[in-house]
């Protein structure tokens, strides 16, 4: 999980890379204007869209999970560009999906309960990704603003922030908790297709393809008549389409209700529209004040009185049954007074407590939130298991260093997510002592305190991210010279509301995204920690983390944001020339830059320089038709921190001096534009 991070850019960057962004922008703009779409399959079958889909799914860990045909992304990788495109286009002509592999995973802490997952074949997943990339901008323009699950640039933190706002600022202290019984397994296919038609998707061929996806055979069970398979790439989008109608129905009861007088609306700094004047007028009427916050199928309906909450409970129950053919779980659905009871949402439990007086003399209530008991019950055994892996790394099929990395990543992930709870320190402190005792009991003298390390001058390696976040903690421990993140060292961080200006499908919205690129993506950093490069030194893997933090998550040459799968660690002085794995000799670059550094063929060099937007004077190419000749005679005089450096390239007959970003040995004359 990421904290204070830039939004995930992988799909956005890939769309720009394959020149598909303009098409998605137009789909979004047309959908916002209420236009209908009749020829979407032609867009889905475009080579650019298919290439983009392949790039997006190949980076997922799930791409290595086989379907019923036993194939993974590895098999697709063996196909040529033309073969892959023609295969997808041929399947789209008359789409018949292969059977779906059914897998059951544990549901919650109850071992008797299982959650069924449907895993399509890798080719069907690729086609679903192609469809998703075209449908998503159309649907995004129609979705309600208070829906946060499975949508680009939105996450759990934004949903929690909206809940805080409704409870604390809007003083809506009664909540209707509704749990839909088996939502994903009971979606009505006919109703879903009609909802897509209402959204403007009038391409009958696409609707037939979607119907075929929904009715794909489940191996060993048969053909489903209802439900969307959990595990399919397109299922989250379709689930949002189903419940989008509920979002707008609830909004029509209060937020979107028309008024005779056009009240003034102002735009907040985060891009949201303030309707405070309209709401003030509505509160003077007998209308029921109601707002809804939804994350996937988990949603909260807030109101200002118990009577209104009871009415909304029964109205919503009837609406779900009549409109969407969905039933609620009577055991889990209820009305809660937030002044007296906690309400659970996204792993937290929340209520309001009195805290002073407001300006009008009334009692002021603020949000108090904890980690819910079920979530805490999962954390402790997981930590004990990770400590066991550190004690016996060979039994866990990983090295001691890898086991420590996995432990640290897990603890930092807990901190990153649950720091949104106001009482997170109180929740984690009780078993932080238990975890510390477990470390001491299992690892014994292998565990050292920071004081012992300093006093005995023991060698230790602390990645920059751990040093910055936990360096001042007395709870920090060391095992074999590696820092072990303390569980109890955490403080509350208020949830940050979503910036409504951000939008992946408008130029202005993408400009807002790019403003945030100077912050580090903790998800990528966690990935690097969790996946050290095997058969490389510990110094090498630790320096990867330090470099990612020091370079602000960007390529040292192009300045592009580095994403999982696109991070290459380059030795400035090659190892075969005596280069070491020390920090000064390493630099993180993207894949294209790394290919350019090691390229020797002039055509390949030109290709990558065009991709990266670099320029070489014509006179240079005229003089040196084959720059590979020069590559073996390159020496450098520069500093790592400098944006450019002077490079002296020598051969037997010519000397040339030019400025270039510092890359290292085998680098030819590269120029920035």
What are these regions (language model features)?
Residues 12-233, 237:
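Conserved pre-catalytic core of RNA-dependent polymerases
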Residues 142-146, 151, 158-328, 335, ...:
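Conserved polymerase palm-domain catalytic core
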Residues 179, 559-591, 599-609:
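Histidine-centered nuclease catalytic patch
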Residues 215, 220, 324-396, 403, ...:
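A conserved non-catalytic segment of reverse transcriptases
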Residues 401-466:
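Non-catalytic, peripheral interaction segments enriched in hydrophobic/basic residues
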Residues 443-535, 638-640, 648:
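Extended C-terminal regions of large enzymes
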Residues 537-568, 590-592:
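Short cysteine-rich loop/turn motifs with clustered Cys
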Residues 576-584, 596-637, 652:
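Polybasic, low-complexity binding patches
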